[in-house]
């Protein structure tokens, strides 16, 4: 993967505005445990519509894209929460989503993606890893590719968790 310039605070702030109405502003709760002078807080991202913070990044990436690039739909390469985030976001935006998975992906993961409206494309595991690590393209795929980890908008969207933590617990 190519190195990225560090994200700026403004990118996280824009993402925070961008995900309004889709991602839930989850609570930050203190865990009640007696550990020598230690405070532990939990950010309850399990309350997101897909049960994961990955929704934040997927939504921000799609809402930040040029609408013309979304006309053919979106696709990603993931076996789990990012795939569900892209599928959920695409369904909400009324566009097509395809998820490229390794051919040995588990039935439960595939069922969750399909339940959210995603089309599934199975490919050999080695090709799937190459797609994520190097090529970011695959024959026959159309639409906007949303990389599950190295997409700048995905990173900014997921980083909105940090902004919420700072708002709820400024002295963190």
Identify the residue ranges that each predicted region occupies:
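PLP-dependent amino-acid enzyme catalytic core
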Residues: 1-172
């Amino acid at each position: 993967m190519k190195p990225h310039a560090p994200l700026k605070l403004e990118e996280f702030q824009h993402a925070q505005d961008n995900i309004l109405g889709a991602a839930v502003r989850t609570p930050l709760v203190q865990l009640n445990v007696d550990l020598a002078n230690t405070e532990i807080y939990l950010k309850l991202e399990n309350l997101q519509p897909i049960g994961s913070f990955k929704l934040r990044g997927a939504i921000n990436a799609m809402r930040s894209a040029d609408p013309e690039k979304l006309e053919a739909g979106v696709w990603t390469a993931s076996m789990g929460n990012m795939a569900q985030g892209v599928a959920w976001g695409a369904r909400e935006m009324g566009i097509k989503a395809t998820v490229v998975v390794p051919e040995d992906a588990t039935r439960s993961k595939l069922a969750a993606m399909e339940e959210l409206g995603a089309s599934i494309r199975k490919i050999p595991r080695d090709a799937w890893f190459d797609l994520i690590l190097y090529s970011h393209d695959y024959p026959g795929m159309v639409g906007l590719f949303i990389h599950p980890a190295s997409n700048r908008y995905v990173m900014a969207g997921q980083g909105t968790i940090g902004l919420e933590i700072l708002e709820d617990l400024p002295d963190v």
